[in-house]
């Protein structure tokens, strides 16, 4: 089952500023995934074929038949060939040319594919000179001997000999054995797991190994190894289930290539096709399929035949039906694309976190809906191809084994462009407030010029178009724990959970010491209860961006600084924070690498029961406000959360919180890649 869609392009009309799909490009940009797993999509409606198209197809078939008959009449009988008779009367003596011995492939065919891709042979200048002299000696006419003499003079010139030496150097390099293939691209993760296993070892060697693996030089080495290995493993060798070959030949007066791919039943072909007039053209090669693994099918190739079945003149639905019944060896007759094919590039896999929800069934612009990859905000995507800047090919984290083909997701620039146009349309539909729309636009432009301020974080976030954030795996060191930031609406239990952790395990958890401008009281100690500072010093630190969050209470300033959090981390403890949404940007832009957990409220009735245990009797509208506030926080800041806990029961939530914190010691976590640079 498949669905056909056009590769839509967003255009802005001159009048309404809206979006439109270019109707004229429907036939040209339609794509269908052929030989896809049946659960990936639904069937498309057939394309209506006009009588004129049938007439053109018939005319082309008649012309091809006439050309074949003409070539047959022009063929000469080899037995009556005057040239062959003359050669048989005066046969030429064959000459052994040692310079060409290494150029012959296994099949001995000079026109075969293997001879074209074989590495250059190493030649000796003396052998070349000897072969030329033998050729000159065997020639009878003086003109040919003079021609060979000119070649001999050329070979003996210093410039030619330098070029000849360069040729041999390149040939020597290309004939070298390939470097060893990497076994894994997760050496850094393995080293971190080993470090955790041996850090409490009772053996001297185990402690020494733990110390060695925790050094910055070793971690940098493992990171460099994984970066190189990840690139090397991108171009993996052909798997045994995909055998392929390619030959060039003439077909109907055109130069075509014949591609044979042996495809297993569990490996989809992984290609999309589109109609271009009466032609069927390969539109996209999808990662993970037999077409991509063979490396012989390319975008822009026109399909003429598949296993002897003529394809030209058929629509994409018919092509789907033809391929649905074919297994084993698939033989394609193709007209190669006229586009110049650049050599394959070892693409680096880019890991991103999705900051928006995406459902391809609701996207009219996805070029091939059955290949669209559905994902939710917070999912990790592995981008394996960005050849098409508008539509990337990706896998969801954890689905690589269950997802045979890569899926299509919107490219970052494309997603930003169409979201910006949606916002423009919505703004244009809003009623004018003062008679001129320019007023609102000027206000918006002024916000962008405003310096980032935690107190105005909501305005700052409204200007962003959330798409993707590049991520990398990070395993926290044993002596430098990530701070835990709890966030949620009031009365959702985040403060109670924090206090329980602090009182239950004081040797493991600690809170940052806040700053204040009020006077110190008798029982208080500077640096233990508060950092007591002057109002001027507090304002200077606030202007310098040193506070995660700050506020004023009874004409005194209070604030939590990044330095206070860092002091807790330096002691080896886990710093616990309860912060507001306005503080998340400052916290994440620091070097603290926080782990942010959202504490969400349960249903309204369950929330009422939880608050009743604390002798609280909120009104129904207050409960609705808490739930609505949580929904707004998740909608506006959910892309910044690392985990979420629905607090249906405080004891269960406490155990879940402990599980998430303990997991940071044993498993690497996805963090923004900018944190590791």
Curated annotation (Swiss-Prot):
Residues 39-81, 506-526 are annotated as: Disordered. Transmembrane segments: none annotated. Expressed in the retina and in the neural tube. Residues 1-347 are annotated as: Required for the correct localization of PALS1 and PATJ at cell-cell contacts and the normal formation of tight junctions and adherens junctions. Residues 258-338 form the PDZ domain. Residues 347-419 form the SH3 domain. ATP binds at residues 488-495. The keyword Membrane applies. Residues 481-662 form the Guanylate kinase-like domain. It is a peripheral membrane protein. GO terms for cellular component: adherens junction; apical junction complex; apical plasma membrane; bicellular tight junction; nucleus; photoreceptor inner segment; plasma membrane. Residues 51-76 have a biased composition (Basic and acidic residues). It is found in: Apical cell membrane; Cell junction, Tight junction. Disruption phenotype: Morpholino knockdown embryos show disrupted epithelium organization and cell-cell junctions of the myocardium at the 16 somite stage. Loss of myocardial sheet coherence and heart cone fusion at the 20 to 28 somite stage. Reduced extension and an increase in cell density of ventricular myocardial cells resulting in defects in remodeling of myocardial cells during heart tube elongation at 36 hpf. The keyword Transmembrane does not apply. Keywords: ATP-binding, Cell junction, Cell membrane, Membrane, Nucleotide-binding, Repeat, SH3 domain, Tight junction. One of its GO terms (molecular function) is ATP binding. GO terms for biological process: apical protein localization; brain development; cardiac muscle tissue morphogenesis; cell-cell adhesion; central nervous system neuron development; cerebral cortex development; dorsal motor nucleus of vagus nerve development; embryonic heart tube development. Plays a role in tight junction biogenesis and in the establishment of cell polarity in epithelial cells. Also involved in adherens junction biogenesis. Required for polarized epithelial organization, cell-cell adhesion and remodeling of myocardial cells during heart tube elongation during embryogenesis. Functions in cellular patterning of the retina and development of the retinal pigmented epithelium. Also required for embryo body axis specification. Belongs to the MAGUK family. This is Protein PALS1. It comes from Danio rerio (Zebrafish). The lineage of its organism: Eukaryota, Metazoa, Chordata, Craniata, Vertebrata. The gene is pals1a.
